[in-house]
Design a protein with these regions (language model features):
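Active-site and adjacent substrate-binding regions of carbohydrate-active enzymes
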Residues: 120-144, 151-161, 306-368
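Alpha-helical scaffolding within the catalytic cores
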Residues: 44-48, 65-70, 100-105, 164-173, ...
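Glycan-binding loop/region signatures in secreted carbohydrate-active enzymes
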Residues: 21-37, 41-42, 230-321, 343-369
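Conserved, mostly hydrophobic/aromatic
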Residues: 60, 119, 183, 228, ...
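Glycan-recognition patch characteristic of GH18 chitinases/ENGases
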Residues: 17-110, 133, 141, 201, ...
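A cross-domain feature marking catalytic cores of carbohydrate-active enzymes
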Residues: 43-45, 64, 83-87, 121-123, ...
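Substrate-binding surface in catalytic domains of secreted glycosidases
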Residues: 103, 123-276
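Cleavable N-terminal signal peptides of Sec/SRP-targeted secreted and luminal proteins
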Residues: 1-18
Length: 369
């Protein structure tokens, strides 16, 4: 079923010889077609990709070790495979160093027959600082270089769930979005800075999430540049106290100036959540205000925990907004976090998560209040 990887074709890349790892030379050519709707998957390594829903996947960002078999298979399905791009901003304030970083990644993409780069820089930046201007220039120059050297390539940039200097990431979001092919909005970790009560809350509350897209579009960023990122993981919080109303008070862990944050909790994959929820004290609960599921359980020491996560119901509500607002697409962090074993129950659970990405885009109406 899976394409065999064999060294069969030699191609010239950047003046040196790179050997095509696929059984057919055409599978080493950059993907040229533009997808009207993007389903953007982050992959962190291993072979989970063999179980992705390739009927909808359009781009895979390879955040794990390079996998030639994944490259060949993605290309056989018309999907792009793109590099991860990360660099300390202090290293690219200098224009010459910036150009060297870009060329290094262009040449790497060529050697590996890849289709572009996802720039994932989540560092704190002060507005109008040298780093602020360097980051904007980096995205513009990277896009220009990739487009010139690898026709059809895609350059994307990951942004925080809101443009309001989240975690002190004060970027020139409008200029960045204008200069690259798309921006992946990381609509998760929305409790990274808690300024109010230090309590467990949803990873991506619906109204807060959608309001942030209105803010991005209010900056005159084209909706067709925005890909909504949803979480395939949740947060497990230890409760210092669980009130009668179900409010879980959590330990204070400061982050970038805020007195409390989701760093108080532990990230857990959806696959683990599905195993744990049936034996939990509460079973699945639903918060009508945040439009998100959660549950409570006791650990081996008798300590109460509260877990907030996203599931097909909460993701479908967000996917509906994607269609209503005609965003560029939807994606997730990350594709590896589902259970892809052969148990029929978990297979159904995983299929429902994939289906939630697209099933209600054009039928449901979401209003931000």
């Amino acid at each position: 079923m899976w394409l065999a990887v064999s060294l069969v074709v030699a191609l010239s890349v950047s003046g040196s010889s790179a050997v095509c790892p696929c059984t057919e030379e055409r599978l080493c050519q950059p993907v040229q077609n533009e997808h009207e709707f993007e389903v953007f998957v982050f992959d962190v390594g291993g072979k989970a990709w063999k179980f992705y829903d390739w009927s909808i996947v359009t781009t895979v960002a390879a955040f794990g070790k390079y996998d030639a078999e994944l490259l060949c298979y993605a290309h056989s399905k018309g999907a792009r495979l793109v590099l991860k791009g990360d660099v300390p901003l202090l290293d690219i304030v200098d224009a010459a160093k910036r150009k060297a970083w870009i060329m290094e990644n262009v040449n790497l993409a060529k050697r590996q027959f890849m289709d572009g780069i996802n720039i994932d820089i989540e560092q704190a930046v002060e507005e109008s600082s040298p780093e602020y201007h360097a980051l904007t220039a980096l995205v513009k120059e990277t896009t220009e270089m990739f487009h010139r050297e690898i026709p059809g390539s895609q350059v994307s940039f990951d942004v925080a769930w809101s443009p309001k200097c989240i975690d002190k990431r004060c970027y020139d979001y409008k200029a960045i979005a204008d200069s690259c092919d798309l921006v992946f909005v990381m609509s998760y970790d929305e409790q990274s800075q808690i300024w109010g009560d230090c309590i467990a809350m949803a990873n991506a509350p619906l109204n807060q999430t959608l309001t942030a897209y209105d803010q991005y579009m209010g900056m005159k960023i084209d909706s067709k540049k925005l890909v909504m990122g949803v979480p395939w993981y949740g947060y497990d919080y230890l409760c210092l106290n669980l009130s009668q109303e179900g409010i879980c008070t959590i330990p204070e862990v400061p982050f970038r100036g805020a007195p409390c944050s989701d760093a108080s909790g532990k990230q857990i994959p959806y696959s683990t959540i599905m195993k744990q929820i049936n034996s939990s004290a509460s079973g699945r609960l639903w918060d009508k205000i945040q439009q998100a599921p959660y549950y409570n359980y006791k650990d081996d020491k008798g300590t109460i925990h509260q877990v907030w996560y996203d599931d097909p119901e909460s993701i479908s509500l967000k996917a509906a907004y994607v269609g209503q607002q005609k965003l560029r697409g939807i994606g997730m962090w990350n594709g590896n976090l589902l259970d892809y074993t052969d148990d029929p129950v978990v297979q159904q659970q995983s299929a429902e998560m994939w289906n939630a990405l697209i099933q209600k885009q054009h039928t449901a109406s979401i209003t931000v209040s």
